[in-house]
Amino acid sequence: MTSSVSTMHNNQDQQTTQLDFITLGIESSCDETGIGLYHSELGLIGHELFSSVKIHAEYGGVVPELASRDHIQRVLPLIKAVLADVKFTLQDLSGIAYTAGPGLAGALLVGCAVAKSLAWSLDIPSLAVHHMEGHLLTPLLEESQPEFPFVALLVSGGHTMLIDVKAIGQYKILGESLDDAVGEAFDKTAKILGLGYPGGPALAMLAEQGNYGAFKFPCPMVGRPGLDFSFSGLKTFVRNTFAKYPSKKEDIAKAFEVATTQTLMIKCRRALEQTKYATLVVAGGVSANLSLRKKLNQMGQKLDVNVFYPRQEFCTDNGAMIALVGYFRLSHGQHDTHHEINIKPRWSLEELSQIE
C-alpha cells in the first residue's frame, strides 16, 4: 500500500464550513484500488492506493475475477484511512465520484456500488467519472498547470489517443490506436523477451542497457497521413528479431522503445501543428516512461510548446484524479440522477458533457 497526503495543501486542523466542497474519489477500473479526497479550498488533501499487481504477476496479466475480489477487500479500509489521515468523517463529504468506465465490468461494479451506497446513506450526490478524463486532467493537480486549449496524449495499457481539449468535457479524438494500445505493446513485448509482469517498467529498465542503433525497428504509420496509431506489427517485428537474435534482449528492448516513443513524438508534433496549440498534456501509465518524456520535452523546446505531465505516482491509476474530476463536475451541479448501479465498460470521451 502506498499512502500520500499533499503537504502543500493539507492542513489537518482545517475545520469544514458550509462553503467547503469535499469530494471523495473511488478508482477501481482494473487492478488498483485508489481513493482520493479533494477539497475546494485546499486542493488534494489525501489519497491512498493499493495495487494487486503481485496477485496477477504469477498469471502474466490481470485476472478480472481476482481484481474484483481484491477491490471488495480494499475499498472501505482505504476510504477510512484517507479520512482518518485528515481528521475528516464521512459526514464531511459533499459528494462521491467513482470510475464508471471504461474498464473491467466486475471491478467497476465494486467502486460504483460502494459510492452509490455511501452517497445514498449520506444523502449527498454521486457522480460517474470517465476513467480517461481522470488521466487527462491529472496535471491540474500540480502547481504548474496547463491552460486550455491543449492537445492531450493519453497512453496506457488500454488506450493510445490524441485529443483536442478545448475545455473540461469538450473533447475531440484526433487519433487513436487501431489495434494494441502502446502500453499493451510494451507488456506483450516484455512477455516475448521473457520479462516479468507488469512488462512496461521491466522493458524500460532493460532498454537502458541496450545499444542505440544496434537494431532499427520501423515507426508504425508515420509514413501515412493522419493521427491514428498501430503497434501490433511492431510487436511481430520484435518476435521475429528475437527469434534470430535471442542473446540480444537489451538491444531489442532499446530498439522497441526508440520506435514507439519516436512514433508517439511524431504524431504529437502533427497534432500540435494541426491544431496550432502551444500546449501538450501527456498522461496515463506510459507517460511515466523517461525516454518518452525526454523526446517530447526536446520536441517542445524546438516547437516552443509547453509540455505537462502528472507526477510519477499519478501516471498510473489512482483515486486522486477521480476526486479531482468529481469535484469539477459535482461543484458545477452535475451528478447521477438515480441510485441504480450504472457502469460503462465501453465509453467514449466524446460522449461527455461540458461544464457550464
UniProtKB/Swiss-Prot annotation:
> What residues bind substrate, as annotated?
154-158, 187, 200, 289
Chief location: cytoplasm
Reactions the enzyme catalyzes: L-threonylcarbamoyladenylate + adenosine(37) in tRNA = N(6)-L-threonylcarbamoyladenosine(37) in tRNA + AMP + H(+)
Keyword list, A-Z? Acyltransferase, Cytoplasm, Iron, Metal-binding, Transferase, tRNA processing
Please share the entry's free-text remark on the cofactor: Binds 1 Fe(2+) ion per subunit.
Q: Where in the cell is it found?
A: Cytoplasm
Q: What does this protein do?
A: Required for the formation of a threonylcarbamoyl group on adenosine at position 37 (t(6)A37) in tRNAs that read codons beginning with adenine. Is involved in the transfer of the threonylcarbamoyl moiety of threonylcarbamoyl-AMP (TC-AMP) to the N6 group of A37, together with TsaE and TsaB. TsaD likely plays a direct catalytic role in this reaction.
Check the record and name the NCBIfam families matching this protein: gcp_kae1 (TIGR00329), T6A_TsaD_YgjD (TIGR03723)
Q: Which PANTHER family match?
A: TRNA N6-ADENOSINE THREONYLCARBAMOYLTRANSFERASE, TRNA N6-ADENOSINE THREONYLCARBAMOYLTRANSFERASE, MITOCHONDRIAL
Report what the protein is called: tRNA N6-adenosine threonylcarbamoyltransferase
Query: Which species expresses this protein natively?
Result: Ruthia magnifica subsp. Calyptogena magnifica
Q: What is the lineage of its organism?
A: Bacteria, Pseudomonadati, Pseudomonadota, Gammaproteobacteria, Candidatus Pseudothioglobaceae
